[in-house]
Swiss-Prot record:
Residues the record marks as active site: E144, E149
Region of interest (Disordered), residue spans: 361-424, 448-647
Described function: Mixed-linked glucanase involved in the degradation of complex natural cellulosic substrates.
PROSITE patterns on file: GH16_2
Catalytic EC class: hydrolase
Residues anchoring lipid (GPI-anchor amidated alanine): A643
Low complexity composition bias: residue spans: 397-417, 448-480, 488-502, 517-534, 573-622
Subcellular location: Cell membrane
Family, as annotated: Belongs to the glycosyl hydrolase 16 family.
Glycosylation sites: N63
Protein name (database record): Probable endo-1,3(4)-beta-glucanase AO090023000083
Enzyme Commission identifier(s): 3.2.1.6
Length: 667
C-alpha cells in the first residue's frame, strides 16, 4: 500500500469518528416510524373509557357501540378520524352530563418522538375542556404529560407536566412559550409546571388555519414540544423522516433538576373532551363566559352546558394521523417469526411370517401403541394400517420373543404388500372348512393325550407347552401339535382375519419336520388344564377352531375371500385307506371383518362375527402319500389358511386313523 493511500485511509477513519457521533446524537433522522394510527385502523389502537370522569366533569362518556350509532365517532371521506360530542340534546342540569368520547391507547409507550396531525380541535367554547395527553399507570409517580390542553374560550395551548415529589424546571431553556409555573411535583399542588403557548395555537384560531401539527420529543433528559401551523410543517415530517434538529425552537423545552428517566415511565395516550369539571368549571367566570350563579362558577358552567347544545357543534377532534417514531428500530415493530413444524407419523404394523409362533385369542384388550414385530424369517412383510380404535394387545406383563425358524422349516410364499390407503378400513373375509371325523380307539400322541371335552369334541393336552389358556367363556380350542405362523389372511382362534392378496392358486409351501423350539405365545391368565386321560373312543378335534355362534353375532352378506392354504405334514406314512369320515357335507364358516387389522408376533384380535353356510358339493378327502413320504391333503375349492385349519390334520388325527384300521384288521 502506498503512503498516500495509507494517509487517505487514516483520514477517512478519523473523519467518520468525528461525524458519526454528531449524527447519532443530534440528527432527527435517527427516528424511524414504528406505528401509524389513522383512518379505518385508528381505533385498532384504542379502547373506550366509559366510567365516571376523574375530573368531576358534567359528561357522560360513551362506549364504542353507542358512539358509533349516535355519530359521535366516524371516519370521514378524506380518511380522517372524527370524534365529537352531543350537540343536539338539551339536558337537565341535575341529570347526566353531555355525551362525549374518551379513548385511551391499548398499550403503554416509552421515550420517542410522537407526532399528531390535527385538522380540527375543539373550538373556543365555554364549558369545554379538551385534551391530548399521556399518563403512566401509577399517577403521579409515573408522570403525566399534557401535550394539548385548553379550557373554555381558550386560544393558546397550555403544556403541563405532573410528577411526584418535587421537580423544578429551568425557565432559561430556549422555547417560544411562557413558563407560568416551574414546579412539576405534587408537593406544590396539582397545578404542575406550565408553559403557555402563543395565541392561535389552540381553539378557534387553530382551526381557522386548517389545523396543524404538534410534535413531542421525549427523552430521559428532557421533553420538547413543537407546534407547526399547516403552512409551516417541516418537510422532514411530511416526507415521513422527521429531523428534530431542523424543527427550530420548540414551544416548550422542559428540563430541570429532576431525572426525567425516573419521573416519566411508560405512558398511555388519551384523547378526550369533557365539560366543566375542576379546571374548566373553576375558572368559568374568569373566561368571559355567562355566569348564571356568581356564587357558584361550577354550577354556572353546568347550567350553560346543559341548556345550550348547539354551542358544542365545533367541539370535535378531527385527526389526520398520530405517528410514533423511535430510535434504532425499523418501520415495522419487531416481531419474532415463529415457524411451526409439524411431523406426521404414518402408523402401521409390520408382521413377518414366523413359523414357530402360536397366537392366542384375547376377548377384549387394548393396545397402547402400534408396534412393529420382525423375526429372522425369510418371509416378506406387509403393512397393516393402525386400527382406528385399537382393541388388541399382548396380554400379560411380558411377551415372549419369537425364536428364529428351525432349519427344516421353509418360508411361506411372499405375500404382496397391502395397499395402504392411510386410514382406509381393511376388510377381510375367510372361509373355514370344518371336517368331523370319528375314531374307534384312543391313542396317545407324541406330545399329548386326546381327552374328552364334552359335546363330542376332544382336546389335546400337550405334555410340554408354553401356551396358557385364556380365561374366557369361549368354546375350547384344540392345541396344535405344530405351532403355525400367523400369516396375512389368517384368523386366529376366531379372531379378525389378516387381509391378504395371495391367490388360491398359490398355496403356501409345505412345512417339513417339527420345530424343537418351545412354542412362545402371549401370556394369558392361568386356567387349570384338564387332566390328561386316555380314552377308547372319541372324535378327532374339528378341523377349524371358530367362535361360538351363540356368543357372537352372524353378519349377513358375508362372502369368502382368497386366502392361502395351510397343510401340515407328518413323518408317519399315510394309510392306504382312511377311516370313515362322518361328514355329510363340510361346514363352511365365513368370517367377515370390517375393522382395521392390528397384527403382531403374538396376535390378539377383537371379537369377529362368523356366518355359517353349508355346501353339499365340497367334501373333504383323505390325505394321500407323496413321493417324499409326507402326506398331503386335497385342497378344497377355496383353500384357506387359518390357525384352526392348521390343526385339522395332525399327528393326533393320523394316529387315531391308524388305530382304527389296526382294530378293524384284528377284528
Amino acid at each position: 500500500m502506498s503512503s498516500s493511500s495509507f494517509v487517505w485511509t487514516v483520514g477517512s477513519i478519523a473523519l467518520s469518528s468525528l461525524i458519526t457521533p454528531t449524527i447519532a446524537d443530534g440528527s432527527g433522522s435517527r427516528y424511524q416510524l414504528t406505528e401509524a394510527w389513522q383512518g379505518e385502523k385508528f381505533l385498532d389502537h384504542f379502547k373506550f373509557f366509559s366510567g365516571s370522569d376523574p375530573t368531576n366533569g358534567f359528561v357522560t362518556y360513551a362506549n364504542q357501540s353507542y358512539a358509533e350509532s349516535s355519530g359521535l365517532i366516524e371516519v370521514t371521506e378524506s380518511g380522517s378520524f372524527y370524534m365529537g360530542v352531543d350537540y343536539k340534546t338539551k339536558l337537565s342540569p341535575n341529570g347526566p352530563g353531555r355525551d362525549s368520547v374518551r379513548i385511551e391507547s391499548k398499550e403503554y409507550y416509552d421515550e420517542g418522538l410522537y407526532i399528531i396531525d390535527l385538522q380540527h380541535m375543539p373550538g373556543s367554547v365555554c364549558g369545554t375542556w379538551p385534551a391530548f395527553w399521556s399518563v403512566g399507570p401509577n399517577w403521579p409517580y409515573d408522570g403525566e404529560i399534557d401535550i394539548i390542553e385548553g379550557v373554555n374560550k381558550h386560544e393558546a395551548n397550555e403544556i403541563v407536566l405532573h410528577t411526584s415529589g418535587s421537580c423544578s424546571l429551568s425557565s432559561e431553556n430556549d422555547m417560544s412559550g411562557t413558563m407560568t409555573s416551574s414546579e412539576c411535583g405534587e408537593s406544590s399542588g396539582t397545578i404542575g409546571c406550565v408553559v403557555k403557548g402563543q395565541d392561535g395555537t389552540s381553539g378557534a384560531p387553530f382551526n381557522e388555519k386548517n389545523g396543524g401539527v404538534y410534535a413531542m420529543e421525549w427523552t430521559s433528559s428532557f421533553v420538547k414540544i413543537w407546534y407547526f401551523a399547516r403552512s409551516e410543517i417541516p418537510q422532514s415530517i411530511t416526507e415521513g423522516n422527521p429531523d428534530t434538529t431542523a424543527f427550530g425552537t420548540p414551544m416548550a423545552h422542559l428540563q430541570g433538576t429532576c431525572d426525567f428517566g425516573e419521573r416519566f415511565k411508560s405512558q398511555k395516550f388519551i384523547l378526550d373532551t369533557t365539560f366543566c369539571g375542576d379546571w374548566a368549571g373553576g375558572v368559568f367566570g374568569d373566561s368571559g363566559c355567562p355566569v348564571s350563579d356568581p356564587s357558584n362558577p361550577i354550577q354556572s358552567c353546568v347550567n350553560y352546558v346543559a341548556e345550550n347544545p348547539a354551542a358544542f357543534k365545533e367541539a370535535y377532534w378531527e385527526i389526520n394521523y398520530i405517528k410514533l417514531f423511535q430510535t434504532g428500530t425499523g418501520h415495522s415493530t419487531a416481531s419474532v417469526a415463529s415457524q411451526a413444524e409439524t411431523a406426521t407419523a404414518v402408523a402401521s404394523n409390520t408382521v413377518d411370517s414366523i413359523p414357530s409362533v402360536t397366537s392366542t385369542a384375547i376377548p377384549e384388550t387394548t393396545a397402547p401403541a402400534p408396534e412393529t414385530v420382525s423375526a429372522e424369517a425369510p418371509a416378506t412383510s406387509s403393512a397393516v394400517p393402525e386400527p382406528a380404535n385399537p382393541q388388541t394387545s399382548v396380554a400379560g406383563a411380558e411377551t415372549t420373543a419369537a425364536p428364529a425358524p428351525s432349519p427344516e422349516t421353509t418360508a411361506a410364499p411372499a405375500s404382496p404388500s397391502l395397499d395402504d390407503s392411510d386410514g382406509a378400513d381393511a376388510v377381510s373375509e375367510t372361509t373355514i372348512y370344518v371336517t368331523e371325523t370319528t375314531t374307534i380307539c384312543g391313542a396317545s400322541t407324541q406330545k399329548g393325550t386326546i381327552q374328552t371335552i364334552g359335546g363330542g369334541e376332544t382336546e389335546v393336552s400337550p405334555a410340554s407347552s408354553t401356551v396358557e389358556s385364556a380365561a374366557t367363556p369361549a368354546a375350547p380350542t384344540p392345541t396344535s401339535q405344530k405351532p403355525v405362523a400367523s400369516l396375512p389372511g389368517t384368523t386366529v382362534n376366531g379372531g379378525t382375519p389378516v387381509p391378504t392378496d395371495v391367490s388360491p392358486e398359490t398355496p403356501a409351501e409345505e412345512t417339513a419336520g417339527e420345530s424343537g423350539a418351545p412354542t412362545p405365545s402371549a401370556e394369558q391368565p392361568e386356567q387349570p388344564q384338564p387332566a390328561a386321560t386316555s380314552i377308547e373312543t372319541g372324535t378327532v378335534p374339528p378341523a377349524v377352531s371358530n367362535p361360538a355362534p351363540t356368543e357372537q353375532g352372524t353378519p349377513e352378506g358375508a362372502s369368502p375371500v382368497d386366502a392361502t392354504e395351510s397343510r401340515h405334514d407328518s413323518d408317519e406314512p399315510a394309510p392306504t385307506s382312511a377311516a370313515p369320515i362322518r361328514s355329510p357335507s363340510p361346514s363352511s364358516w365365513t368370517i367377515s371383518s370390517s375393522s382395521r387389522v392390528a397384527s403382531s408376533s403374538s396376535f390378539a384380535s377383537t371379537t369377529s362375527s362368523a356366518s355359517r353356510t353349508t355346501s353339499a358339493t365340497k367334501e373333504a378327502t383323505a390325505p394321500t402319500e407323496t413321493d417324499s413320504g409326507a402326506s398331503t391333503g386335497t385342497n378344497p375349492e377355496s383353500p384357506v389358511f387359518t390357525a384352526g385349519a392348521s390343526k385339522s390334520v395332525g399327528i393326533s388325527g393320523l394316529t387315531g386313523i391308524v388305530c382304527g384300521i389296526a382294530m378293524a384288521m384284528l377284528a
